[in-house]
C-alpha cells in the first residue's frame, strides 16, 4: 500500500478541493512523507494555486514512498462533497492506478477513482515586491467580493496607513467597503506606500469560496501587481493564490 491517509472532518477537506476545482480541471498532487502538496495554474493562466498540507494535520499519515497522483478535480469534488462535517475521510492508493476514497460516518462508503496523467507544474512562487499587506476576516472578504459582483466585473484594492478599501465601479453604480483597525474585520495592516490595484471579481469569487467566517486571510499586493492571498488550514496547512491584476486603461 503506497499510502493511507486519514483526515477527520471530511467536509473541511471537501471545501478545499471544491475551491481549487472552480479554477482548475485537473491536478497533480505530490504525496510525500512530509505531506501533500499541489501547484497549478488555471487554463487562462491568470491564477496560480499552491496547496500545502503537512502530515501533522492528518490523524493518520502513512506513505511508503513519494508519489505524484493525477486526478480529475470535478470527479474528486463531487465525491468529497458527499462527506459531512463529522465524517472521517480515508485516502488510499494500492498498486493499481486508482485512488480509493472512503467516507466513514453513519455508514462506510468507498469510491474508487481512476488516476490520470497530469503534467506537473515546476513553477516557484515568485518573490514580489509587495507594498501592502492586510489581514482580514474571511467573512468580510467574501461579502466584499459579493457586493462588488453586483456592480462590476473588477474590484480595486486600496491600502493606506491604517485603512483598507475595496471598491467597485459600474456604469451607473458603485460600492465601497472601508476597513480600519477599529473594525473587527481588519486584523492587521502594513503599508509601505499608498497601494492600488484592481482584480477580476469572477476569479476572486472562486478563490474565497472555501473561506469560513472566522478564517484569517492574508492579502499582499503592490501597485498594478499580482495579489497573493493566503489562508491556513488547521494552523499548519496553507492554501495560497497568486492572481494577476486587471490593468486599467
Swiss-Prot record:
The keyword DNA-binding applies. One of its GO terms (biological process) is regulation of DNA replication. It comes from the Archaea. It holds the Pfam family PCNA_C. Keywords: DNA replication, DNA-binding. PROSITE patterns: PCNA_1. Homotrimer which circularizes head-to-tail (head is a N-terminus, tail is at C-terminus) to form a toroid. RFC opens the toroid so it can load on DNA. Interacts with both Pol I (pol) and Pol II (polB-polC), with Hel308 (hjm) and with Hjc. Interaction with the C-terminal PIP-box of RfcL may stabilize the toroidal structure. Belongs to the PCNA family. HAMAP family: DNApol_clamp_arch (MF_00317). This is DNA polymerase sliding clamp. It comes from Pyrococcus furiosus (strain ATCC 43587 / DSM 3638 / JCM 8422 / Vc1). The gene is pcn.
